[in-house]
Design a protein with these regions (language model features):
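ABC transporter nucleotide-binding domains
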Residues: 3, 10-149
Length: 149
C-alpha cells in the first residue's frame, strides 16, 4: 500500500496542527511517526484514514484521494485509534463478523477465526467486549483494524 502526502495543513481556528507536511511511503515500507505531544501525529493519522479532513493539501492511498474516494480508502486502511470505539454489548466474534460484513470480507467465518487466533483472543471470543480487560479490548480493536487486509 503506497501513501502520498502532499503539503497537508490542518487548522483549528488559527492554530496550525500540521503545516505543509509532505512525504511518500512505498508499498511494503514500515514507518512510524515520532514527535512530542501536540506535534500532530494523531491528527495526520486521522486524515490519512479519512476520519478528519485536511484544511489544505492532498493525500493519496494506493492512488485513491482520501477526500474524493474516502469509502474506497477506508476499505484498504485499517486504523486503531487511541480510544478504541467498540460495541461493549456485542460478543467478540459477533463484533468481528459485523466489521467483516461492513468490509465485505470473503470467507468471513475463516477470517474471523484467523483474527481471533493471531490476536490471542481464542479464550475470550465468546465473551461480551464489555467484560474484557483493556488489553483484550485493544486486541479486539487490532483484529477489526486488520480483518479486511
Amino acid at each position: 500500500m503506497s501513501i502520498e502526502v502532499n503539503k497537508i495543513t490542518k487548522l483549528y481556528g488559527e492554530q496550525k496542527a500540521l503545516n505543509e507536511v509532505s512525504f511518500s511511503i512505498k508499498s511494503g515500507e514500515i514507518v512510524g511517526f515520532l514527535g512530542p505531544n501536540g506535534a500532530g501525529k494523531s491528527t495526520l493519522m486521522k486524515i490519512i484514514s479519512c476520519y478528519l479532513p485536511p484544511s489544505i493539501g492532498t493525500i493519496k492511498v494506493c492512488g485513491l484521494d482520501v477526500m474524493e474516494q474516502s469509502m474506497e480508502v477506508r476499505k484498504k486502511v485499517g486504523y486503531l485509534p487511541e480510544h478504541n470505539p467498540l460495541y461493549l454489548d456485542m460478543y467478540v466474534k459477533e463484533y468481528l463478523e459485523f466489521v467483516g460484513r461492513f468490509y465485505d470480507v470473503k470467507k468471513l467465518n475463516d477470517r474471523v477465526k484467523e483474527m481471533v487466533e493471531i490476536t490471542g483472543l481464542t479464550i475470550e471470543q465468546n465473551k461480551k467486549i464489555g467484560q474484557l480487560s483493556k488489553g483484550y479490548r485493544q486486541r479486539v480493536g487490532l483484529a477489526q483494524a486488520i480483518i479486511h487486509d
